[in-house]
């Protein structure tokens, strides 16, 4: 389970967050590669999840004028992560978008 961010694929969202955006872009590339490497050789499942904007201290520091009450909390996101880590989860090599509530193919790199 890899937790990513839109900052890894959208430079316009990442002003003043270069190191963070670069780390998430690298994480996305690593996950795509690992999924391809293990797709037919292992029972390892690889999922990438983007929680989108969450009510965190980091978000509050970056967006000081934003109303935190309009955002989901990490506790809202956690059950989805737990579900994707459970033995019953069968998908691999996919991307989960928490804000839109869907699993899809990995997005193309920016």
Q: What are the language-model segments listed below?
A:
Residues 1-40, 53:
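Catalytic loop of short-chain dehydrogenase/reductase
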Residues 22-28, 58-61, 70-73:
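Short linear motifs at secondary-structure transitions and domain/linker junctions
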Residues 6, 11-13, 63, 81-84:
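Residue-level detector of functional hotspots within protein domains
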Residues 33, 61-62:
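Residue-level signal for well-ordered alpha-helical positions
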Residues 13-14, 59, 108:
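Short, well-ordered secondary-structure micro-motifs
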Residues 44, 48-49, 56, 64-110:
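C-terminal helical subdomain
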């Amino acid at each position: 389970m890899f937790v990513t961010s839109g900052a890894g694929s959208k430079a316009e969202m990442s002003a003043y967050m270069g190191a963070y955006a670069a780390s998430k872009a690298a994480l996305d590339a690593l996950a795509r590669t690992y999924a391809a490497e293990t797709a037919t050789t292992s029972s390892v499942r690889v999922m990438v999840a983007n929680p989108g904007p969450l009510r965190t201290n980091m978000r509050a520091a970056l967006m000081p004028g934003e109303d935190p009450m309009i955002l989901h909390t990490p506790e809202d996101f956690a059950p989805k992560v737990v579900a994707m880590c459970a033995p019953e989860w069968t998908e691999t090599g996919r991307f989960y978008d928490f804000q839109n509530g869907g699993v899809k193919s990995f997005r193309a790199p920016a």
